[in-house]
Amino acid sequence: MSCFSHVMNPITGENSWQEREDDYDYHQEVANAGFGDMLHDWERNQKYFAALRKTIKGMRAAGREVHVLDIGTGTGILSMMALKAGADSVTACEAFLPMANCAAKIFTDNGVGDKVQLIRKRSTDIKIGADLDMPQRANLLVAELLDTELIGEGAISIYNHAHAELLTDDALCIPARARCYAQVAQSPLASQWNSLKILPNLDGEALLRPPEQLKSCKGEAALHDVQLSQLPAGTFRLLTEPIEIFQLDFQRKEKREKQREKLVQLQASQPGAAELVFYWWDIQLDDQGEILLSCAPYWAHPELKELSASKEERVPVANVVPWRDHWMQAIYYVPKPPQLATVGQDFYLSCHHDEYSLWFDAMLEAPAKTVRRHTCSCDLHMTYSRSRIGQLNQAIRNKRYLRYLEATIVPKQSNVLVLGNGCMLGLASAALGAASVQLHEPHRFSRRLIDSIVQHNELKNVKYVENVEQLEDTELIALSHVFAEPYFLNAILPWDNFYFGTLLMKLKDKLPEKVEISPCEARIFALPVEFLDLHKIRAPVGSCEGFDLRLFDEMVERSAEQAVSLVEAQPLWEYPSRALAEPQQLLSVDFANFNVDHHLQGSIELTQSGVCNGIALWVDWHLDKTNNPKSIVSTGPSEAVVPGEFVKWDMFVRQGVHFPRKPTDLSGRVAWSTDFKPLLGQLKFGFSQEKR
């Protein structure tokens, strides 16, 4: 049975009723739960298994029975490991019912259905006693309750409850403890994700300056989770060695503190601005701390030397450390970065955590009082994503737009309509002397931010438009330019910004014949690639450490077919991929004739050997009709694609990715089709791999 759901279409900008199966939400939750990524993490699996074997063997040698509690069992893999390692009893709990039901089937399929007690509820709801959830307390807890911040999934409270209510006084835990690390760094590139810089003209002179409220804003304390190993080597400078800032003892019977702070005195290893804190953690899986799993970036990884010695020739050194997407590293932005003038200069790092998150500050003098968690006071950080803030600062991108604007804006004559959210470049046309600039800014916070920039730069003749259909005919006929980047807050995939075309069509009949429309055209390109790792987030698991997980694969595949888009958004700079062909154009859209339907098909010859496990897609925006590379703004590769080489991707936008259901390493071609119906806001792609 199906039902209708209210869905926002980013291309039309309208809510529409969409027919979906009753269990669509269930399928979406299953497909996006992320269990598959963890199961492809070979280091995690092997080291958890090794810790279970070692710990259970030690408990047996001490004459103890082993009663295991597995909190958040997922597929049940850790419970099955515990049984195989010799546990007397295993109780597994899982509150996510689709996953719990799948685990029950997996237990049966692996011949342990009658050996694992499965409780379909949260661990904090479990009761101990006869005829209750568990007959007795467990003396070995195995769990994976961690995220990139370590504590973001509620690990502190869950462990506190488990020790108080579910575990014996002498219980052991896997992992036994965790250690958090920080490393202070400077990076002009990464800082672009956090604050708005001066926008210069083509001569390098300031065109738009950020107002005082932006310069004084401390930003958001929230983490920026990234694959730190993929930051280009020349784009950051490490100002300190990694330091341990917090330890979390999972085995301790006493409660783990929900709030802690630590002031660390550091010495600069080189001069620079203490702009960033790089953060990661490691876990000691066994009580003796001999089995270590580290989430460190490659340069700080404790096993880098051993891993580098056995790496494949074509794998970059940044990718020799075990890959995982469920536990990454994080960047925290220092509110007011202190300048470290000399090697060896003392400064202080103030480290804090509450029950779910961390925050940091750095200063030259020890603070007299506790450093409070900082929040955005300028609208920038609460309105825009990190990638969008970086986009606003991207020099090459901005120069291409300004090149167009400086060439076409006639001071005191041009009348400009700017479509999009937070379009600083459109605002620049006012600074270039346009007679009037009308900004389409329906979003309240975005409009307030833009207005603060208008006021600070004393720009005249700027007007805000909430709805383009409210524009008077006399205003429209006077327009010389309709300009966009385009960028809209609702956009997820690059072509969601085709909403620019939808807005244009609402005005088309009232615009003057010679009005300049920029961008005038958009082209979508596709590139078959071989990912080193990203494909694993959608790849079937099959078996893991000798356990059959095909039932899990089938469940996820069924749900993905129902609820996962054929193309999803990913920041590809974080996930190395090798080009298997030249990029090919799949669609060209003329914004002056946006309402035309398109149906196209073709094929891409694979010119390089390798496994085509992904197809990357992006949009090139053509600012004018010259086809001059300097008039094209791409959301794809930042350098020319060379088949067989790793692709360098734009770091300030997410690209689209299609993951083939069954990738092959057969040489041949990728057949594709594109179906675009702009009035319905439908853009569909089809891909299939064919032998040559």
Curated annotation (Swiss-Prot):
A single GO BP annotation from the record? peptidyl-arginine methylation
Name the CDD domains for this protein.
AdoMet_MTases
Protein's UniProt keywords contain Zinc: no
Q: Which GO terms describe its molecular function?
A: histone methyltransferase activity; protein-arginine omega-N symmetric methyltransferase activity
Record bears the keyword Repeat: yes
Database matches in Pfam families: PrmA, PRMT_C
**Protein EC:** 2.1.1.-
Record protein name field: Protein arginine N-methyltransferase 7
- Organism, per UniProt? Drosophila pseudoobscura pseudoobscura (Fruit fly)
**What gene is this protein translated from?**
Art7
